Swiss-Prot record:
It comes from Borreliella afzelii (strain PKo) (Borrelia afzelii). Keywords: Cell cycle, Cell division, Septation. Pfam families: SpoVG. GO terms for biological process: division septum assembly; sporulation resulting in formation of a cellular spore. Belongs to the SpoVG family. This is Putative septation protein SpoVG. The keyword Transferase does not apply. NCBIfam families: PRK13259.1. The lineage of its organism: Bacteria, Pseudomonadati, Spirochaetota, Spirochaetia, Spirochaetales. Could be involved in septation. InterPro entries: SpoVG (IPR007170), SpoVG_sf (IPR036751).
Amino acid sequence: MDITDIRIKKVESKNSGSKLLAYVAVTFDNCLVLHNIRVIKGQKGVFIAMPNRRTRVGEYKDIVHPISQDFRKTLQTSIFKEYVRENPADLELELDF
């Protein structure tokens, strides 16, 4: 499955402590779109979080997620490259790609 499009919607937060940087939609093979991937700035750097939902007991469960580490790395690298391309001022972020 090839990534054919990545759309980034940067989140401009008035709260300086906000960790959410952007929402991402990734298109695969021009056939399937995965929405609501989040780019988050954590204590150990920037990472992606997959779409999830809250269960009745308050736990968050991923709706969809990569099965292999290789694909997660490919997806994360592609998203980070597009994020930096669209937001060159954010180059100081600790992006792992």
